Amino acid sequence: HVSALGADTESDSDYAVTKAEGETAVREAFPRAVILRPSIVFGPEDSFFNKFAALARFLPALPLIGGGHTRFQPVFVGDVARAVAIALTRQDGRTYELGGPAVYSFKELLQLILRETGRRRALIPLPFGLATIQAAFLQILPKPLLTIDQVRLLRKDNVVSPTASGLADLGITPTSVEAVVPSYLWRFHPKGEYAGAQKQARLLSQ
């Protein structure tokens, strides 16, 4: 069962609560089921790196919600897929928290996105209170850029617990953000495919 890092019935976030309730339902029905809790997942079609890279195309600045201090441990979609395949053979009733090899602050992730897309944008600190007010209006839209529940999630770090079972316990070496994200963020670079080719050439020459 694929859940999410931060699943918690006591959370202020509806998303975190529903994920925890899903885990409980699975455990009650299948006591030996394996539960996987990934941090934010990255890959060519992800909803994090692609979203902010797209926003940087037309916004003069990007918001650092809560000052940009929230920590994340992004995990590669390919590693999550491998974890699912291995979990299907185990049925040991354990919960595994899935995170990549490095932890980044929200600010550091936005800086990485801007660097890889060749964009210069101001990063403006936005207190949680103001972010909540903005989200209240934005979430009225059909495809909101921000919701109140997302702001609530950003109040808590999204990293693997040092005592939790993880990718290593499944025999998986985590893939870094830097090894994958540049291969698809070139689409958002002002120079497009040319910038992507240059990046690949530099990586191959190292």
Question: What feature does the model see in each segment?
Answer:
Residues 1-29, 33-39:
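Conserved Rossmann-fold NAD(P)-dependent oxidoreductase catalytic core, especially the SDR/UDP-sugar
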Residues 60-77, 138-162:
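Low-complexity, charge- and small-residue-enriched intrinsically disordered regions
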Residues 84-147, 161-206:
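Mid/C-terminal beta-alpha module of Rossmann-like enzyme folds, strongest
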Residues 13-20, 44-62, 107-108, 120-121, ...:
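Acceptor/aglycone-binding surface of glycosyltransferases and processive sugar-polymer synthases
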Residues 54-75, 79-99:
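A conserved pocket-lining segment of Rossmann-fold NAD(P)-dependent short-chain dehydrogenase/reductase
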Residues 8-9, 43, 131:
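Generic structural signal for helix capping and beta-alpha/helix-loop junctions
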Residues 13-14, 34-55, 70-71, 77-78, ...:
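Flexible, glycine-rich beta-alpha linker
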Residues 36, 64-65, 98, 126, ...:
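Hydrophobic residues at beta-strand termini and immediately following loops
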